[in-house]
Amino acid sequence: MNKKETRLRRARKTRAKLAELKAVRLAVFRTNCHIYAQVISGCGSRVLAAASTVESAVRSQVANGGNKQAAEVVGKLIAERAKAAGIETVAFDRSGFLYHGRVKALAEAAREGGLKF
């Protein structure tokens, strides 16, 4: 089993539990160059809010999309957009990534922005 399969296995366990609870979730995905965040409905079929370092609004604020500063900007932006959509409480879906570095920075910025999880 390689590193990617291990991460996907962890992600599958988390998503199965969140699907069982029908919880609105904040899903995070990261690559070497970018980080993406989506608020997904409890049924799992609708994206209610999204933010990423690919967007021009974020790219104008940060030079590099693959660092903690960029993750903090995305975290604040996703919290702002989720609150605008009427969402206060979410379940954090780290997609099998360790809660460290950019994933942690995004989560803490989203909490500072007003999301509860």
From Swiss-Prot:
Q: Name one GO cellular component term.
A: cytosolic large ribosomal subunit
Keyword rRNA-binding attached: yes
- Gene Ontology annotations of biological process type: translation
| Pfam families registered for this protein in UniProt | Ribosomal_L18p
Q: Which superkingdom heads the taxonomic lineage of this protein's source?
A: Bacteria
GO molecular function annotation = 5S rRNA binding; structural constituent of ribosome
Q: Which cysteines are joined by disulfide bonds?
A: none
Record keywords: Ribonucleoprotein, Ribosomal protein, RNA-binding, rRNA-binding
Database matches in HAMAP family: Ribosomal_uL18_B
Family according to the record: Belongs to the universal ribosomal protein uL18 family.
Q: How does it assemble?
A: Part of the 50S ribosomal subunit; part of the 5S rRNA/L5/L18/L25 subcomplex. Contacts the 5S and 23S rRNAs.
Q: What does this protein do?
A: This is one of the proteins that bind and probably mediate the attachment of the 5S RNA into the large ribosomal subunit, where it forms part of the central protuberance.
| UniProt-recorded name of the protein | Large ribosomal subunit protein uL18
